C-alpha cells in the first residue's frame, strides 16, 4: 500500500507549467437526455463521489477529441480547446462538429501551441496530437510500430506518447515485462526525461545503448557483410513500415 501511495504521489507531482485540462468534448445529446460533457487532461481526476471531473487523454472516451471531424463526428457535437500561458487560462475556442456548412479551417489556439518556441527540455504534445499521430499512439500492443519522418516531425514525441498510452491501457502486462526507453546518448535522455513524468508515468526506465551493451561486447570496424546486410535490413524494415501503414505527417 505504501509503495502504491508513493507511486500515486509521484504521478500527481505538480508541474508549474502544467494545466488540469486542455480540452473538452460535448457529446451529441439524443432526445430529452442531456448531452454528456468530458474535460480532457493529462491525468484522471475524480470528485469525492468518484465521478470524473477530468478524463485521462488516453481513455477511450477521449479519442474523439483527437479524431472527430465534420464528416465523422464520432458522436461529438462540440470540441473545445483551452489556451493557457504559464498555467493561467487565456481563452478557449469551440468547434461545432454538427452545424451545417464548412467548419473552421484551423484553430488559433492549436496553431499557437504548435508554433510555441521549443526551448529547454522536450515538452509533451498531448494537447496538440494530430489524428494521424493518434492512430500511431493508440495502435495495438501486439503490433510493431516504426515511425519514420524528417527531423522535427515529432517522431520522438509520438513514440513517448505511445509509451505512455501502453502504460495506461495495458499497465499490468507492461508492468510485468517492464518498459525501457533507449536513447542514443545521455544528452538525449536528459532532453526527453520530463515527458513521461508530465503524463503521470514514472515507472519507465531510460537508458542508452552503451549502458545496456557491455563495452567488451561491442566491436568497431567495417561490417564483414558489407552493403548486402544493409540492403537486407532495409528491405525487412521497409516491409514492416509499409505493413503498419503509419506515418508522421511532414
How would you describe each model-predicted region?
Residues 167-250:
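Alpha-helical nucleic-acid-binding subdomain
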Residues 159-160:
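Post-Walker A alpha-helix
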Residues 155-156:
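Conserved lysine of the Walker
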Residues 1-135:
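Extended, charged low-complexity regulatory segments
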Residues 128, 135-145, 171-172:
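Phosphate-binding P-loop
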Amino acid at each position: 500500500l505504501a509503495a502504491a501511495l508513493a507511486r500515486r504521489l509521484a504521478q500527481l507531482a505538480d508541474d508549474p507549467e502544467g494545466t488540469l485540462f486542455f480540452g473538452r468534448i460535448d457529446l451529441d445529446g439524443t432526445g430529452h437526455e442531456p448531452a454528456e460533457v468530458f474535460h480532457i487532461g493529462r491525468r484522471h481526476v475524480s470528485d469525492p463521489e468518484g465521478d470524473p471531473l477530468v478524463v485521462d487523454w488516453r481513455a477511450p472516451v477521449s479519442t474523439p477529441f483527437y479524431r472527430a471531424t465534420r464528416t465523422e463526428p464520432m458522436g461529438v457535437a462540440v470540441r473545445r480547446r483551452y489556451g493557457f500561458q504559464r498555467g493561467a487560462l487565456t481563452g478557449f475556442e469551440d468547434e461545432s462538429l454538427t452545424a451545417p456548412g464548412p467548419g473552421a479551417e484551423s484553430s488559433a489556439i492549436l496553431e499557437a501551441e504548435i508554433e510555441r518556441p521549443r526551448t529547454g527540455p522536450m515538452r509533451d504534445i498531448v494537447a496538440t496530437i494530430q489524428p494521424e499521430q493518434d492512430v500511431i499512439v493508440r495502435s495495438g500492443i501486439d503490433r510493431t510500430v516504426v515511425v519514420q519522418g524528417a527531423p522535427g516531425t515529432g517522431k520522438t514525441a509520438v513514440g513517448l506518447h505511445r509509451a505512455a498510452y501502453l502504460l495506461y491501457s495495458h499497465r499490468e502486462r507492461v508492468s510485468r515485462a517492464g518498459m525501457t526507453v533507449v536513447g542514443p546518448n545521455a544528452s538525449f535522455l536528459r532532453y526527453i526525461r520530463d515527458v513521461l513524468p508530465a503524463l503521470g508515468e514514472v515507472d519507465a526506465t531510460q537508458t542508452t545503448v552503451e549502458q545496456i551493451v557491455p563495452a567488451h561486447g561491442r566491436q568497431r570496424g567495417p561490417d564483414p557483410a558489407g552493403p548486402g546486410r544493409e540492403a537486407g535490413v532495409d528491405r525487412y524494415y521497409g516491409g514492416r513500415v509499409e505493413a503498419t501503414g503509419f506515418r508522421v505527417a511532414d
